Amino acid sequence: MSISKAIEKVEARYAHQPEFIQAVKEVAITIKPLYDAHPEYDKLKVFERLVEPDRVFGFRVNWEDDNGEIQINRGWRVQFSNALGPYKGGLRFHPTVNQSVLKFLGFEQIFKNALTGLPIGGGKGGSDFDPKGKTDSEIRRFCYAFMRELHHYVNKDMDVPAGDIGVGGREVSYMFAMYKNLTRESTGVITGKGVGFGGSLMRTEATGYGAVYFLQNMLAAQNESIEGKKVLVSGAGNVSLHAAEKATLIGAIVLTVSDSKGTIYDAKGLNQEKIDWLKVQKDQHKPLADYVEVFGGEWMADQKPWSIKADIAIPSATQNEINEEDAKLLVDNGVKYIVEGANMPLTAEAIDYIRLHRVHYAPGKAANAGGVAVSALEMSQNSVRQYQTFEQVDERLQGIMKDIHDSSAQASEMYGQTDEGYIDYMSGANMVGFKRVADALVAFGILN
């Protein structure tokens, strides 16, 4: 079956899952030159197999709030592909979570994980539980209840979840404690743990730092440096603040961070003191707008960062945060590089627009793979009961991000997607990730 026919089949079968369809189409369109060059992929229906998860688990999560009321949420775990290793992907707690969102994230995770070159498959999970406004006791009770259900489907050799939006170190700790209580095993079943009980140094920083390392390689490919470049960052969570931190440390001028209520614009640029203040502010769930009272700058209520002149954008908030109108603003304001810190933060129309205007674009599956790369290193450390230093992990991370950049650029050129120095990282990354998984599926026959 041709790629176009496969897309039609997905659209018909999952018409009610727009995020998933968007992710599938983005990969399908860009891998066509590779797919056409390998008839064995079509013969064994590799693409059709990859768009269907191995399995999807759904479950009810009952928990008790501080008023003694029983609350009910939905939970899911999507085990998409274990062709390259155990299922690996985060858990997201957010009211927008549904099967479509988790399937899009799990599908992307297959190729992101493949790009790292590490032996991990792709999966994703989460719940429509909203941590905002909940007390620590309520979050703890929910995490315990969630893991009571999830523990049936995960273990260190089959499926290893991690954190994502709404799931940080606190939530991972609660879930890990419940897993140990239920199974009487202390294993590497979940990553993002505290360093004192099996976690890896640098896991917190990895996604944001990794995105900036990828950006450095993009700039170097164009004979440019990050020094003095003006950067727009969206979001104010873990990825956003660590991307801002690393960019600042190596000489960029980070002008913005944002949340759902608006954007901080600091024309002087962030520094370490300001970033440390922002980390505390977000950890304590206090308003981002307070920044202006402490450090000055401008609070742009109900606005995104994209109307500000800059060289680089790192969207790190959530999926589809940049639409076509935002993309036009970015181009009009001089942005030449876009690096996705979040998963699929650009709509399909926005991607088409920036590529048409030759903006250098790094898709999330390549640019934000640093988080899962260090998660895999945590799994390795757990298996041999040894820790690596921050410097050792950072060196590995820089090497992994360089390899992802270089392999994506080489694939772009090999399949005719590079034009007068403009590297099509989206096509390149999709082809590299897809080929690694597809070759494994061909080797396995029809059993995987």
UniProtKB/Swiss-Prot annotation:
The record marks 164 as: Important for catalysis. Keywords: NADP, Oxidoreductase. The active site is at residue 124. NADP(+) binds at residues 207, 238. PROSITE patterns: GLFV_DEHYDROGENASE (PS00074). Optimum temperature is 25 degrees Celsius. One of its GO terms (biological process) is glutamate biosynthetic process. Homohexamer. This is NADP-specific glutamate dehydrogenase.
